[in-house]
Amino acid sequence: VEYGYQYLVDGTIKIGDPYATKILDPWNDKWINASVYPNLKAYPAEYTSDIVSVFELNPAEFNWTATSYERPAENSLAIYELLVRDFTEEGSINAVTAKLDYLETLGVNAIELMPIQEFDGNDSWGYNPCFFFAADKAYGTEEAYKTFIDECHKRDIAVIIDVVFN
């Protein structure tokens, strides 16, 4: 079960939790395709405005399968930097996962994801993050991100995440 919450500062300012791992955005979530993020919790417009933080009680455990992964030596990295939004037509982490065999044939042993943290809007390179611990829902679910990492590790591909602390 997921719950939404906000902090009320000085009785008038509503803000999301800066440490939240998921947020609801009244302006941008409506543009997220249900095939990319199925069952996205609806924004509680009848109760509030601005960003709402989300937490989940007893989330399902992810079953990591690439348990013997070892990262490549730093001096042997062949890094492919990509922006999830532009790498495929769908612009989702699931679509990137579907292209891992192709990247592997190129000799890639590390993928650097351009920023994937939540940022203002859905059309940006992500260098304007606003919630550093929340992966961008426009690219997919938390499980989809974990599946991507697990599938990379099955192929001995490291995952590097580009972060910007503005």
Predicted regions and their residues:
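Conserved beta-strand->loop/alpha-helix structural units within folded catalytic cores of enzymes
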Residues: L103, K146-V164
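Aromatic-lined carbohydrate-binding/catalytic grooves of carbohydrate-active enzymes
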Residues: Y102-K146
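The substrate-binding groove and active-site-proximal loops of carbohydrate-active enzymes
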Residues: Y80-N94, N128-E142, A158
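Aromatic-lined carbohydrate-binding surfaces of glycoside hydrolases
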Residues: F119, V163-N166
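The feature marks proteins involved in alpha-glucan
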Residues: V1-I79
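Hydrophobic faces of well-ordered beta-strands that scaffold small-molecule active sites
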Residues: A78-L82, I111-L113, V159-I161
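Extracellular/periplasmic catalytic domains that process cell-envelope and extracellular macromolecules
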Residues: R71-S76, E104-L106, H153-K154
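Short amphipathic alpha-helices and their capping/turn segments at secondary-structure boundaries
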Residues: T67-S68, T97-G107
